[in-house]
Amino acid sequence: MFKKILMLALTLTATTSLAKIKTETVEYKQGDQVLEGYLAYNPALKGARPGVLIVHAWMGLDEYTKRRARELAGLGYVAFAADIYGKGIRPKNADEAGKLATEYRSGDRKLLRARAEAGLDELQKNKMVEKNHLYAIGYCFGGNAVMELAMTGAPLKAVVTFHGGMDFSKTIADVKNIKAHVLILHGALDPYSPMEQVQTLEKAMNDNKLDYQVVFYSGTVHSFTDPSAGNDPSKGAAYNPVSDKRSFLAMTDFLQEMSK
C-alpha cells in the first residue's frame, strides 16, 4: 500500500512546492521534562505511511533539522523531529553545544536513550503512521542517539546515521539488541568520529549478524550535510555538497526498500 502512496508522493513533489507540507510544533514529555518536537507531513496523502524519527545535531532542534523533516514529508513520510534537550533549551554556540551534548553522551546514556524513546513514542501515537514501518535518522549527535535507541531493542525497521557520533565504547554490548536494518553514511576523513570507531561498530554488527551497510565518502569530513559548517575541511567539519546529495539519495533508496 505504501508503495502506491510513495509513487503518489513523488508525483506530488514534482508538481507542488514543499510549502504544501503541513507542519506542527508538538509538546510532549519524558518524565517531568517538557520537550518540543516538530511534525511534518503531506495532508494530500491518505492512509497510513511509514514514520521517520529525526534526531538533531548538537545545536539542538534547529531550522536545519526542520528542513530535513519537511523534505521527508515531501517524499510521503510522516516525519517527527525529536527534541533531546528540552523545550527552550537551545545552545547559543559550539561551546554550549559541546557541554550539553556531553551530558547526554557520558556514562550509560540512559537519559539520551530515554529522550530518543520519548520521541519515538510520540511518533507512534500519530494515526497517520504505519506502526510496522518506523525509521530513525540522525545527524552528528543525533546519529549517535538513534543508534543508542536501536540498541534498546526499539521497534525500528531502519536506522540511518549521517556523520554520526560513533563512540559506543560503553554500550557496544547492546548492539545485540538491534532489530533494525542499519545504514551508516560517513565521511572518510571525519576526525571527530574516526574510521576506527566505525570499524568497531561494524565488527559488533557483523558479529551479531545484523543487516547493515557502511558508506564512506572520500575527501569528506564531519558535518558534511550541513551548509552552516562552512567550506574549510581543515577545520575537521565542513559542508560537502556532493556527499550531501549522495548520502540523501542513499537514504531515500534505503528507506524505499524498507517500505516494501
Q: What function would you assign to each model-found segment?
A:
Residues 206-260:
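C-terminal catalytic histidine-bearing segment of alpha/beta-hydrolase fold enzymes
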Residues 25-126, 226-238:
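Serine-hydrolase catalytic machinery in alpha/beta-hydrolase-like enzymes
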Residues 178, 184-186:
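Short beta-strand/loop motif that positions the catalytic acidic residue
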Residues 138-142, 146:
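Gly/Ala-rich beta-loop-alpha elbow adjacent to hydrolase catalytic centers
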